[in-house]
């Protein structure tokens, strides 16, 4: 998948100074390229037989919704504070460049549902780790993590449950 790196734009000092942002929008605007990237993930995730894919706000929603649609399974959204209606469960966590909070609707899934967590990028693992803990706190059975891009030098995998499936397609 390294040949797809040419479609990923790098933006220095965004969203904060010292961060090199990986912009996947050029991939999303090219249907054939996006399909080439998504097809292996679709196949891998289907072997795990999840009940739901949980996408992390906001860039995780894009591909998570496409995967859920293709796999004919439900989509669960994990959002930033005050974006979901009704009762929510939340958790605070540290980012590569600060602190944040994630929330999930309290009764969005059946107890012990198999959940595959998806985000566009794995950096430090803080966001994905917090989202995984949130799924467990909400009664879900987290079965793995999937990402389009991984920044390997930040060792984000070390902050994820090592007993679970972790898949990334493009590594930097």
Curated annotation (Swiss-Prot):
It is found in: Cytoplasm. Keywords: Cytoplasm, Glycosyltransferase, Purine salvage, Transferase. It is an enzyme of class 2 (transferase). It comes from the Bacteria. One of its GO terms (molecular function) is AMP binding. The keyword Cytoplasm applies. GO terms for biological process: adenine salvage; AMP salvage; purine ribonucleoside salvage. SUPFAM superfamilies: PRTase-like. InterPro entries: Ade_phspho_trans (IPR005764), PRibTrfase_dom (IPR000836), PRTase-like (IPR029057), UPRTase/APRTase (IPR050054). Pathway: Purine metabolism; AMP biosynthesis via salvage pathway; AMP from adenine: step 1/1. Its EC number is 2.4.2.7. Homodimer. Belongs to the purine/pyrimidine phosphoribosyltransferase family. This is Adenine phosphoribosyltransferase. The gene is apt.
